[in-house]
Amino acid sequence: MTTPIHWAWVILTASFITVFVNYSIRLGYGILMPEMIVSLKITKAQAGAIASSFYLSYTIFSPLLGFLTDRLNVRKLIVLFSFIMGLGTFLMSKPASLPQTCLFFAIVGVGSAAMWTPVVTLAQRWFGVNRRGMALGILSIGYTIGYGIMGLALPPLVVRYDWRTCWLILSLFAFALVPLNGLLLRAKPQDLNLRPWGEQPGFLPGNHLAEAKARIRYRELLKLPNLWLVATSYLFIAFSAYVINTFIVTYGTLELGFPYAQSAKLASAIAFSGIAGALIIPILSDFLGRKKCLIMINTCFALSALFIIYAGNNWLTLLLAVSFFGIFYAAAWPMYAATAADFFPRQATGSVLGFWTIFYGIGLILAPTLGGYIADVTGTFIWSFFMAAIAGGLGTFFFSRLKRPGEGEG
């Protein structure tokens, strides 16, 4: 007799597709950036400001959505903001000026704010404690594959049509998330009289329901030193990652002189090399611990930036450098999400992730504009990447001070 598929896997599939589309759009901008710089006649700093407009709105809305995720129906939130993301992506095919482009990408950022914290929180609700690393590792492949495919698919579309058509196509994928999530997502296992997949028999649905009613106050969370240590680490690691991610294709095209389609493969190398890291490192962390694995990830971010600088215009070495970066880039975000569930009260996961996203967003806002400005002033991205290496080191320092619950974190 065939065993029915646990609905947790349906949730994970829909979440996977949602993350895939979201990151195809979000990171697709960095791939399209060289063409948009030429077409819109903007500087690297202005191109960075467009990315920063996305991250500004993303940062403003993410804490609100984290708060609402713990209190409202997460399915309805994801459906609504999928539509907003689709609308903003459609408008990205229409801008005629820098202010318009910033506004339209900011709308995309509003929608995208619900495509990570609520989705990750939902996925964790459907899986047991010892299966979260696995589930989040699988989920994170969505953004690596999305980013990787964009590096291969967008350049031919730009050549045949233009960058505006690429945004139009991406908007269709975003709009498709509305019916997909509306039909498949469920807010919690108890809605279907299920317990999380992989949960031990001693954990009954009623226990989770009682836990959900025991709301933890935001003021109590803010007193926890661990909250601030991880948040600060998150800021620096986000800055480090997105200086590289935002500008690596532009660096290859406009500074090193590689053909556009070839430079776009640097993005694909980051993404596809990340599949192994996204699968192996989160699962490994279920046994070795999140802290050890995240210290390793932060350290390797710093080393990756230095490796990219060292590679120069040697294509094979550069490809190897960005691939090394990709392994740890893909694993970082689900690992931080799992840390929220492990080091803080379970019923506050959405609020914790939402709070951290403020700091994450600050790093993301600063990275494109500051990285682009330094490249304009110095005439090279080398100093921008060196700054990313320093940020990776600072991320390691702050995360290394994290204490396990009950070991004096207050």
Give the predicted meaning of each segment.
Residues 104-142:
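Cytoplasmic helix-loop-helix junction between adjacent transmembrane helices
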Residues 139-192:
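Helix-loop-helix hairpin linking two adjacent transmembrane segments in secondary transporters
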Residues 41, 73, 94-99, 128, ...:
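Helix-breaking motifs and short loop linkers at transmembrane-helix boundaries and internal kinks
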Residues 268-280, 285-339:
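C-terminal transmembrane helical hairpin of 12-TM major facilitator-type secondary transporters
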